[in-house]
Regions:
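Active-site-proximal alpha-helix that buttresses catalytic centers in soluble enzyme cores
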Residues: 1-49, 78, 91, 96
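Phosphate-handling substructures
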Residues: 5-6, 45-104, 161-164, 178
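Glycine-rich phosphate-binding loop signature in dinucleotide/nucleotide-binding domains
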Residues: 23-26, 109-116
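Acidic, low-complexity terminal tails and accessory targeting/binding regions
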Residues: 25, 55, 62-73, 131-179
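Short beta-strand scaffold positions
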Residues: 32-33, 100, 120-121
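Catalytic metal-binding/acid-base residues of hydrolase active sites
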Residues: 36, 59, 124
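Active-site signature of alpha/beta-hydrolase-fold catalytic machinery across serine-
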Residues: 44, 128-132
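Generic beta-sheet signal
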Residues: 115-123
């Protein structure tokens, strides 16, 4: 069984709503992270479609280190007061490390032969990709993304997101960072 907790009742409802939202959309491949809840979301969203499903570890959530499993507010307080290249205490990832990893995941998706890919990930990777798909750099205080909501990005937007994340990671800063 994959690691992590499965979907809550609300999560199941959200994944089923995603299935309805995607009912008329073509999907050639489904991609999830190693965590059980993303795989369950993907399976529910795809329903009975005969679509290959794969796990792409590089799409996982940021490594929270010492904050893993604790209140998200504690991680946010730390993140809002440290630069993006600061290593997260307890062996976690810096935001720049996560951005480079996510850019690599996008490259891997772009290299696949399938044209339409449904990728299920986590809050920070999704926000970073959506923002970077229009050339925007990540912010310290990310705007939350709704659970199980579809964001439609074409190949050019995904390529721009990967390039933008790498460019930001090479010279990281947060305009909204509290010193």
């Amino acid at each position: 069984m994959p690691p992590g907790e499965g979907l809550s009742e609300k999560g199941v409802s959200e994944a089923l709503a995603l299935r309805t939202a995607l009912a008329s959309e073509e999907v050639d491949l489904g991609v999830a992270t190693p965590l059980l809840r993303t795989q369950e979301t993907l399976d529910l969203a795809l329903g009975e479609r005969q679509v290959e499903r794969v796990v792409l570890p590089a799409l996982r959530e940021i490594g929270f280190g010492a904050f893993e499993g604790g209140p998200l507010a504690e991680y946010r307080a730390w993140a809002w007061s440290h630069p993006p290249d600061a290593e997260c205490p307890g062996g976690g990832e810096s935001r720049t490390e996560a951005a480079v990893r996510i850019a690599g995941a996008l490259d891997a998706l772009l290299d696949l032969p399938e044209e339409v890919i449904l990728a299920v990930s986590h809050a920070l990777p999704v926000r970073y990709v959506v923002d970077a798909s229009d050339g925007s750099f990540p912010t310290a205080r990310i705007t939350p993304v709704p659970h199980a909501e579809a964001f439609f990005l074409d190949t050019d937007a995904v390529r721009l997101a990967a390039e933008t994340l790498r460019a930001w990671a090479a010279a990281p800063s947060f305009a909204d960072l509290v010193a």
